[in-house]
């Protein structure tokens, strides 16, 4: 199965990028569409899917909770608030990526401060994140009430999670984030696996639990942040990708397979969104939300039947 996943990614990516050639038309126009529209869109889908898959795997491993993911605990919402603030308030003064990073890291800091006060981790992190997520989403809605209707529409599409009109700058954002933060997580993989045995056992085996936890959370947060910058706050993918990977391999915290599963899910969702009748313009985030909700419902039904 591990050898099949890269092949699936290549097939989906090849088909996704070659769409204009299947539709016929002028060859020069097709070349332009391929280089400036479909190829960047495909590369962003691969990168954002991989980043979200990795981020979800880390959050679920650290919280020891299947609901741990950057969209549920407020990281994506914080990144959205930061990106919108930069694009609407501090126009041309800061890159959108910088605003998104500040927003996401502020949310992470608030969650960690809450956990420090309560002195607990795990489920408490999920609850704290959900509360902060609700507050961040309220800020987003408040921001939308003060902008022009055209801007509000564009922001709403982006907030749904969209791969439309992706550029090479978006490819650069996600393409630079994955090698840096992905390799950082890869370097922490062994201590993270040891920490699954329990913090006390990990400390006995020489793992600095607090340092590994903090670095892993920062790397996972920044991966999710750059996915949001590149493709908008796509929901459920970071939650579902680690579950599917575990179902396939029966092993926890497989970073590379989880990244590929995330890419496959986002590429598939984008192809499904584009397969709808022209003019429907369904954001890919709507598709991932629907598929993710169905998947979780199936899991709940199976658990209930047991």
Task: Enumerate the predicted regions with their spans.
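Alpha-helical transmembrane segments in inner-membrane proteins
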Residues: 1-306
């Amino acid at each position: 199965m591990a050898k099949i996943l890269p092949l699936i990614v290549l097939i989906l990516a090849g088909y996704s990028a070659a769409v204009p050639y299947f539709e016929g038309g002028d060859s020069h126009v097709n070349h332009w569409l391929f280089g400036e529209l479909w190829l960047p869109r495909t590369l962003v889908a691969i990168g954002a899917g991989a980043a979200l898959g990795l981020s979800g795997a880390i959050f679920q491993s650290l919280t020891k909770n299947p609901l741990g993911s950057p969209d549920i605990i407020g990281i994506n919402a914080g990144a959205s608030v930061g990106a919108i603030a930069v694009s609407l308030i501090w126009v041309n003064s800061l890159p959108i990526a910088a605003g998104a990073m500040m927003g996401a890291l502020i949310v992470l800091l608030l969650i960690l401060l809450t956990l420090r006060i309560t002195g607990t981790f795990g489920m408490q992190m999920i609850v704290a994140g959900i509360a902060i997520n609700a507050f961040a989403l309220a800020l987003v809605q408040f921001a939308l009430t003060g902008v022009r209707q055209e801007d509000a529409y564009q922001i709403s599409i982006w907030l749904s999670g969209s791969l439309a009109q992706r550029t090479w700058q978006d490819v650069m954002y996600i393409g630079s984030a994955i090698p840096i933060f992905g390799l950082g997580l890869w370097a922490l993989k062994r201590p993270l696996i040891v920490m699954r045995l329990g913090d006390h056992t990990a400390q006995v085996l020489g793992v600095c639990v607090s340092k590994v936890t903090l670095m892993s959370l920062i790397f996972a947060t920044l991966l999710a942040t750059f996915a949001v910058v590149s493709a908008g706050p796509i929901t459920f993918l970071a939650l579902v990708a680690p579950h599917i990977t575990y179902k396939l391999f029966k092993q926890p915290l497989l970073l590379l397979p989880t990244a590929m599963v995330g890419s496959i899910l986002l590429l598939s969702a984008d192809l499904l969104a584009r397969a709808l009748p022209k003019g429907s313009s369904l954001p890919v985030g709507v598709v991932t939300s629907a598929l993710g909700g169905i998947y979780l419902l199936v899991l709940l039904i199976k658990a209930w039947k047991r």
